[in-house]
């Protein structure tokens, strides 16, 4: 009896050990890299202000109303701050953590439908995707959004392959509605366009109306509304201008116009998608062709008795990925992370058909090594040419990245290694190598974070020192200072908040008058603006400067 219990414990530990090792690799540099402008600073600061004010309904950025995105990530990060305090890792924990959870999500779904070997192949594919690894390690909304949306879509497919009328169908469908609500609270109503568009298109292609009859809309919509609606209702009641800005400006106007100034050609996402799937491009192409021509697999259950067609999960995932690509390619606003939700489902598709984790992992590890070497060397050459020197830290991170990639590549030649070990080494090599490249990038000038600038200025500040941001707003200054700034002659993404509270605006002339009267103050200037006003005789002493900001003291 005791021996049996011991064996079970060892087996349980063996099952969890790979995930523990992957997690250690995944979170290795979460605290090492400084927050980067602009997004990481923004999504670190808004939760800090929520926690400081106690207002978890109306998001504020630099103490101005900020309604571009829903609050789920703000809430989660504020909880992290309340428990552990502000730091790089607490600001990134939610987004980076849920990006990591995508690995477990894909594994669980593929294993349930297609077996353990396919599941391991899918994890290998996702774990070596350069695009997924880079975006997944940044404090953006896209990592968490990708998890919730992917979970909703995969839960929907599990409901559709369950026996009609079974408890599993209802359970998975309600889970899909709840997960979709969390996706809406992560990034907005685009969830309906992507998931709903995929459902409509799939139905038209398959001529399968049975899918619609199994949505459990009454209970599902009720659950969805219970989770998603309260915040939208409360924020609208407190801020009557919210609905027009959020639903119209941030969704319809963003898609139909170029007002957000993120104009890119229609093919913008194609090379990014190639970067995402490059290590497993050939298996994916074969899986895509197979999913379209013969999308059913023996391990997939289920059509309703007498139905002319059955639900085909892999074909649905393929349609869903295509909807994401086409929708964002047609949009007037394009940013690289928008297509991140494609990557987990494409990895699941590749894994379901290839069913050879060791082969995929070996190929990916060998292909990644030269790419990492070129990238590491390219960053060093860039620094040498632009800055006339290469920081010591850049050399260190470059060597670490190359070492991680080479170790994984060399290990791939061990033909007798178990598939799990082969996948684990390849994934850890890729995860670490791309993180180390990100670290190399951050230490090469110009500074892409205000962390060092703030550290140089902090000794000259007191809790009551007036702070100004003149001609610019650098997003990482506020979270590292733990303070908000008075904007001077600048609007940018804070224009809506300034329109809501016009008394918060300050012209450069008003600033100059107040600055001259101050006995103690610090201003963060755009370098060009500082040069102009210094020549005009504006008093001040430069405390610190980098390529983007000049910190000036009134003293």
Where are these regions (language model features)?
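Membrane-embedded architecture of ER/inner-membrane glycosylation machinery
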Residues: 2-8, 170, 174, 287-555
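Membrane-integral, polyisoprenol-dependent glycosyltransferases
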Residues: 2-362
